[in-house]
Amino acid sequence: MRRWLLENQQNRDKNLPQGFSWVEEKRLAGTSVPVSREHLEALVQEGVAHLVSLSPETPPPSTPIDGLKITFIPVEDFEAPDSGDFRRFFKLCERAHALGQAVAVHCRGGNGRTGTMLAAYFIWRNNYDAESAVKFLRTMRPWSVESQDQMEALVRLHQVIGAASVRDVPLCLIIPRLWISSCL
């Protein structure tokens, strides 16, 4: 908790959105909604090349910023992403990281939906079970994952992915419902 508070103060000094923090240094971050052009510019200065917006009710400013691509994956507040949302996010991270680019995820407050997507990443990438992913994430972002629906989605994701290493398996084989469009 102390680390999170210290980072939050440093982020204000850098003009980053409230709650910005790296969960994988210079690869993956979570944040609350960027509300100004200055926030977007600060994200780019911090090394973020892709911003994933989960909140249809509070999108980031629409002003184009050089070096920042914004992807919308709308999820209602306190709801959980579905398997297609997870798949889009994983593919985006895979492509960005292959190019050495960092990704940041936001919802309105940077807690529930953002935390759910970040925990899903750890389930997918590090083979964590849902509970371990949330516990690990909460060491960095204490208020991550806010609803039972969000936790249940993470449990289902882990059940689908299973304990096998999936980093080299096509996503269409991990999430079978989606195989038609992604494996052709």
Please place each PLM-identified region on the residue numbering:
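Ser/Thr-glycine-rich phosphate-binding loops at phosphate-binding pockets of nucleotides
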Residues: 114
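Conserved G/P- and acidic residue-centered "switch" motifs that form tight phosphate/ATP-binding loops
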Residues: 110
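Cys-dependent protein tyrosine phosphatase-like superfamily
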Residues: 1-103, 117-184
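Short cysteine clusters
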Residues: 107
